[in-house]
Amino acid sequence: RLGHGKPKCLVDFGGVSVLAHIMSLLKDVPDVRVVVGFMETAVIAELQRVRPDAIVVRNPSFRTTTTLHSYALGAQHLAGDCLFMDADLLIVPETFQAFLDGCRPGEARLALTASKTKDAVYAEMAGQAVTGFRREDPTAFEWSNISWLPVRYFEDIGMTAVYEHLRRYLPMASGEVVSFEIDTAEDLAQAKDNARLFGLTAT
C-alpha cells in the first residue's frame, strides 16, 4: 500500500532504514529472528549489515500467506514467550524499553499506541486490559503490532490477520508505546514529521 516498490522495512529515514532502527531497539536481545519474503535478498543484505547475528527465517509463500504465518514461522522451535513485532514501525526508544521492562514470563502483553494510523486496529479496553479489537469507530488506542506472547499461541493458526487470531486469547494486559506505522503514504508522511523522536543515527 505504500507503493515504493520495496519492503517497508527498507524505507530510509535520513540514512537509517526502518530495519536498522528496529535492530537498534533490539540490541540487547540475544536471539533475534527476522522473517523475510518480498525482496528477501535486499532485506537479508541490510540485516547482515546492521545485525549480522540475527537468524533469517524464510517465508517463500509470502504472497499467499499473512503476517500471522510469518509469526508462526519465526516462533518455530522456541519455547516460552517471545516478543513479536512487525518491521514497518518507527518507535520512540524509551517507550519501547519501558514496554519490554514491563513484560513478565507467562503473561501475554500487547503494546498500544495513540490512534493515528490510517488503517488501524483499534483496542477496546477495560482498565489496562485489552478486551477486543475493531476496525471501525476509533478508540483512543490502536494495537501497535508489538506483542509479548507465549509461542504456543501460534501452534494452531488459520488464514487470518494476527489481531483476529489473538481475539481468542483476550483479555490481555497492555502497555503504551509511542510508535508510527508506515503502511500508507499518509502514515509515512506522519512518521517523517515526527522523525526527531526516534533517535535515528546513521551507521
Annotate each PLM feature.
Residues 1-43:
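N-terminal glycine-rich phosphate-binding loop and ensuing alpha1 helix
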Residues 9, 31, 53-55, 171:
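Conserved beta-strand segments of alpha/beta enzyme cores
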Residues 12, 90, 148, 181-182:
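Short aromatic/basic micro-patch
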Residues 44-50, 194:
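Short, aromatic/basic amphipathic alpha-helical patches
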Residues 51-125:
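Conserved beta-loop-beta/alpha segment of the NTase-like Rossmann-fold superfamily
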Residues 92-166, 171-175:
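Conserved core of the sugar-phosphate nucleotidyltransferase
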Residues 151-154, 163-203:
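Terminal amphipathic alpha-helical/low-complexity segments used for targeting or macromolecular assembly
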